From Swiss-Prot:
Gene name of the encoded protein: ackA
Protein residues bound to substrate: R88
PROSITE patterns: ACETATE_KINASE_1, ACETATE_KINASE_2
Short name of one Pfam family: Acetate_kinase
Keywords: ATP-binding, Cytoplasm, Kinase, Magnesium, Metal-binding, Nucleotide-binding, Transferase
Family the UniProt entry places it in: Belongs to the acetokinase family.
Function: Catalyzes the formation of acetyl phosphate from acetate and ATP. Can also catalyze the reverse reaction.
Name assigned to this protein: Acetate kinase
UniProt-annotated binding residues for ATP: K14, H205, L206, G207, N208, G209, D279, F280, R281, G327, I328, G329, E330, N331
């Protein structure tokens, strides 16, 4: 089966084409709505790239150009040849708890919760509708970042706010990066020869956005991100957990409105807010040059991450593995070493040589009580697999 995976942003479309779990091509349409828009497609077998630079007025034109480049490359003659299209959807809200085939009711529900994820859901809807128009016979599937976390118990996802905020406004913890946490937990169970339904793990998805997830018997029981991706860990430009009273204080002191506060917390905080850098390669290079703010930022990041991992020991009856994934998780041996050494008393015994050399696989010592693994995330592949399964079973 040929499955196209789409991730539609407000001004971009990321796409990847799979056949029987093998990636054939990937690409990006960017700067949609601007004069200097561009589209690039890469044939992942030959390595050949196909590019166009022109003004792309909207997502519909972007999808038409994707179709043209596929035909030009010979990888796919027409989008109607696809067996299915899987769409990454950031937020499913309280009602869309499972991945599903698209119909009118699903589109209405994604739109209904768009106010909870205003930066993502409206763009996802445009992507789905554009694809339906471009290839009307191809089934579309929605894969929700929030779905994996729907197994959390109510005492884990509820906030101690007036209950009516939950009833009337759906204010609760939803969690994100679910597709990634689901994929790497299954991969880790396979690597360790465990049945996923009996596998307990803590998964750390560490990129510019970062979250941890407590997994019991293959299901999420808690995660660090909340109502939005702002809660939890210190991130590249996001503050993570803070005392909520800081916000009205700053609003009053600095005459800031809600939009100012939102921008400050999401785009000007995190490690960037502390040291002026959000790329950990730059932060670690600055530490080599004795930049104290860079050292502080790294220490804060690793401390918060260690605290979250440690707290999940309190809610899991047993921990089989700690999984590192995403850009920092897969590539930053300094972060992994600092966290695992801080948590050594809990049963983590990291092999520093393996940690420095490997970017995939087990990095704990043979006699480590808890296994430590690097598992590269493949969110698009997971979306393609889910899409294939739903179409086969429809």
């Amino acid at each position: 089966m040929k499955i196209l995976v789409l991730n539609s942003g407000s001004s971009s479309i990321k796409f990847k084409l799979f056949e029987k779990d093998e990636a054939l091509a990937s690409g990006l349409v960017e700067k949609i709505g601007e004069q200097n828009s561009k589209i690039e497609l890469k044939d992942l077998k030959s390595g050949q790239k196909y590019k166009k630079e022109l003004a792309i007025k909207d997502h519909e034109q972007g999808i038409e150009l994707v179709n043209e480049l596929f035909a030009q490359s010979g990888i796919l003659h027409d989008l109607n040849e696809l067996d299915g299209c899987g769409h990454r959807i950031v937020h499913g809200g309280p009602n869309l708890t499972k991945h599903c085939l698209v119909d009118d009711e699903i589109l209405k529900e994604i739109d209904r919760v768009a106010h909870i994820a205003p930066l993502h859901n409206p763009a996802h809807l445009i992507g789905i509708k554009t694809m339906i128009k471009a290839a009307p016979k191809v089934p579309n599937v929605t894969v929700f970042d929030t779905a994996f976390h729907q197994s959390m118990p109510d005492y884990a996802y509820m906030y101690a706010l007036p209950y009516e905020f939950y009833e009337k406004h759906q204010v609760r913890k939803y969690g994100f990066h679910g597709t990634s946490h689901s994929y790497v937990s299954k991969q880790a169970a396979y690597i360790l020869g465990k049945n996923i339904n009996e596998f307990n793990a803590i998964s750390a998805h560490l990129g510019n956005g970062a979250s941890v997830c407590a997994i019991e018997n293959g299901k999420c029981v808690d995660t660090s991100m909340g109502f939005t991706p702002l809660e939890g860990l210190i991130m590249g430009t996001r503050c993570g957990d803070i005392d909520p009273a800081v916000l009205p204080f700053l609003a009053k002191e600095l005459n800031l409105n809600p939009s100012d506060l939102d921008t400050m917390m999401n785009k000007k905080s995190g490690v960037y807010g502390i040291c002026g850098f959000n790329d950990f390669r730059d932060i670690e290079a600055q530490i080599e040059q004795n930049n104290e703010k860079a050292r502080l930022a790294l220490d804060m990041f690793c401390y918060r991450l260690s605290k979250y991992i440690g707290s999940y020991f309190a809610i899991l009856p047993r921990v089989d593995a700690l999984i590192f994934t995403a850009g920092i998780g897969e590539n930053d041996d300094i972060v992994r070493a600092k966290v695992c050494q801080r948590l050594a008393h809990l049963g983590f015994d990291i092999d520093l040589d393996k940690n420095a050399q490997l970017r995939n696989g087990e990095i704990s010592k043979k006699d480590s009580k808890i296994k430590i693994l690097i598992v590269p995330t493949e969110e698009e592949l997971e979306i393609a697999k889910i899409t294939t399964e739903l179409i086969k079973n429809k």
